[in-house]
Every structure is written in C-alpha cells, then in structure tokens.
C-alpha cells in the first residue's frame, strides 16, 4: 500500500457510465445509446484530481439532452444524470449530440451521446416485447414460453423477487447432485 499525493491545483476528471477504463487508455467518452423503447437515463461522474475544490459547468449541443446538474463545485466527485427529452429529440436510428464539461481552469471533456428513436414500430407496439439495447436482450425469466422438467428438477417461479419482480429457481437447492451426463 502507498499513499497518493494529489496535485495542489484542481483538475477535471470525467468517467461516463459503461466506460471500462479511465481516459488515456480510451480516446473518448461516450454514454451507452439511449433507446426510445426503454426511456432510461445514464450517469457521468465528474471528479477532482487535485487537492483544491473544482468548479465545473456543462453545456449541451441540443436542447433534447437533459442533465440533472448544470454546474457544481466538488473536492471529490459529483454524479450527473443524463436523460433525453423524447418530445424534442428528432426521429432516427442514430441521432448524435455532445455534452461538454468545462472546469474554471479551462479544461474541457466531451461526452458523446447517441439516441435510437425510430419512427416505427411505435412505443405502444413494443410494450410487451423484449427489446435489444446496447447489444443485449434482457428477458424476464418467468416469461418463459415452455419448460422441460423431470421428476427431480422442477422450475419454481418465485414472486416478489428480482428486477422484474419475479424470479425462477431451477430444482431444489437441498437435493442431491444430479448426474445428467448421457442425456
């Protein structure tokens, strides 16, 4: 273990949700794609790499990009929630914008924002379907179409548990181990 000495002057640092590494190993900041069918928000962490307080402010390229904080002062870090005004964003499958974060010392970091807002299918048509988002599809386990069980292994739906408010348990966790080789 070793102590890290902070620089005496404030210095701007930015990390966007979904980034695997700090900038330096990656050449730009970008949030995951906003999807009209999911209407989610993402975050950006603004942090201070120095010992004195950091003053910062934000600027967006489009009025449909909404931020929870437009400016601030921090000695450690602050989180900005970013969302989309879906009534103002233009229709299209790859709408782009940027969010700039500037320090009072002249430092600037840009975060790229992309939006998936197709005209068709409508939000109402997609209401009960599973939607791909940023390269994956998340399905509620209890919404299975069919199940295959045997005498020893049953699927048990557990209400009021999990992200979608239902979960599925496979088998009895207290039962002896099953040998399924050769099936």
Regions found by a protein language model. Give the residues of each.
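Surface-exposed binding patches on compact interaction domains or structured appendages
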Residues: 49-81
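C-terminal edge beta-strand
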Residues: 108-120
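Extracellular carbohydrate-recognition regions
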Residues: 119-153
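Extracellular/luminal low-complexity segments enriched in Ser/Thr/Pro
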Residues: 79-95
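A short beta-strand micro-motif common to beta-rich folds, especially ectodomain repeats
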Residues: 44, 90-105, 113
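Beta-sheet-dominated interaction scaffolds and their linkers
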Residues: 2-49, 89, 123-126
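Short, polar loop/linker segments at the starts of domains and inter-domain junctions
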Residues: 150-167
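Short beta-strands within extracellular/lumenal beta-sheet-rich domains
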Residues: 38-40, 166-183
């Amino acid at each position: 273990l070793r102590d890290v000495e902070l620089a005496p002057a404030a210095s701007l640092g930015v990390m966007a949700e979904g980034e695997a590494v700090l900038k330096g190993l990656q050449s730009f900041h970008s949030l995951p794609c906003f999807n009209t069918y999911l209407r989610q928000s993402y975050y950006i962490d603004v942090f201070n790499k120095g010992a004195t307080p950091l003053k910062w402010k934000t600027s967006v390229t489009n009025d449909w990009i909404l931020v929870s904080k437009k400016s601030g002062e921090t000695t450690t870090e602050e989180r900005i929630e970013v969302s989309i005004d879906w009534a103002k964003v233009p229709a299209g499958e790859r709408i782009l914008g940027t969010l700039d974060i500037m320090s009072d010392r002249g430092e600037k970091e840009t975060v790229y924002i992309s939006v998936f807002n197709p005209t068709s299918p409508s939000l109402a048509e997609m209401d009960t379907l599973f939607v791909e988002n940023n390269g994956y599809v998340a399905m509620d386990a209890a919404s299975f179409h069919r199940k295959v069980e045997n005498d020893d292994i049953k699927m048990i739906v557990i209400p009021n548990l999990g992200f979608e408010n239902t979960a599925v348990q496979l088998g009895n966790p207290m039962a002896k181990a099953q040998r399924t080789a050769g099936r």
